Amino acid sequence: MKNFIEAQIKSSIEAKEKILKDGQYIEQIQSIVEIVIQAYKLGKKVLLCGNGGSAADSQHIAAEFVSKFRLDRKALPAIALTVNTSVLTSIGNDYSYKNIFERQVEAFGKEGDVLIGISTSGNSENITLAFKKAKEIGITTIGFLGKDGGENKNYCDFPLIVPSEDTPRVQEAHIMIGHIVCDIVEKELFGEKVDE
């Protein structure tokens, strides 16, 4: 058991080291931060969606924006499209599960907002449809993806693809990236500027 635990920890570290050592990922995270900051400066909001563990990540990241990450500051508008069971089950029943996020993007999204779709496989049809609807409205789309980015990468403006085939490692990297984004956005808007 000890060896298995150590192997899992090493695997998690390796996935994050790949991100750390490849300047492309750092630049992508910087771009995402800049997009979110610009949206907030313009009085816009962030929408987030995902399935399963990625739904939980959507809620987690939204909570960091609305409540706080580190600083006591003004709340930032962020909505996880994964939390209203009446809306989710109504859309799933009246339309289809694939439409659960698309309909909410149509209802809540406004031009200039940001949509972060999270999918470890990159092949979540409901994320693809949400991205398509967002583009119709004029919402900037960001994908936190895994594996090879799947279909989702073709429908978002900024696909960030974690370099791993292992779902748990992808999820761990997604929440790490989400935390980095929240941390820098908060500091840039309300605290000390982050050094280049």
Swiss-Prot record:
Keyword Lipoprotein: no
Domain of life according to the entry: Bacteria
Keywords assigned: Capsule biogenesis/degradation, Carbohydrate metabolism, Cytoplasm, Isomerase, Metal-binding, Zinc
Annotated binding of Zn(2+), by residue: H60, E64, Q171, H179
PROSITE patterns assigned to the protein according to its UniProt record, in alphabetical order: SIS
UniProt pathway: Carbohydrate biosynthesis; D-glycero-D-manno-heptose 7-phosphate biosynthesis; D-glycero-alpha-D-manno-heptose 7-phosphate and D-glycero-beta-D-manno-heptose 7-phosphate from sedoheptulose 7-phosphate: step 1/1
Domain SIS: 36-195
Record field: catalytic activity: 2 D-sedoheptulose 7-phosphate = D-glycero-alpha-D-manno-heptose 7-phosphate + D-glycero-beta-D-manno-heptose 7-phosphate
EC number: 5.3.1.28
Single Gene Ontology BP annotation: carbohydrate metabolic process
Cellular component annotations (GO), alphabetically ordered: cytoplasm
Cofactor note: Binds 1 zinc ion per subunit.
InterPro entries on file: GmhA/DiaA, Phosphoheptose_Isoase, SIS_dom, SIS_dom_sf, SIS_GmhA/DiaA_subfam
A molecular-function term among this protein's GO annotations: D-sedoheptulose 7-phosphate isomerase activity
Cofactor(s) this protein cannot do without: Zn(2+)
Sequence positions that bind substrate: N51, G52, G53, E64, N93, D94, S119, T120, S121, S124, Q171
Miscellaneous: The reaction produces a racemic mixture of D-glycero-alpha-D-manno-heptose 7-phosphate and D-glycero-beta-D-manno-heptose 7-phosphate.
Function: Catalyzes the isomerization of sedoheptulose 7-phosphate in D-glycero-D-manno-heptose 7-phosphate.
Family of this protein: Belongs to the SIS family. GmhA subfamily.
HAMAP family xrefs: GmhA
Protein name per the record: Phosphoheptose isomerase
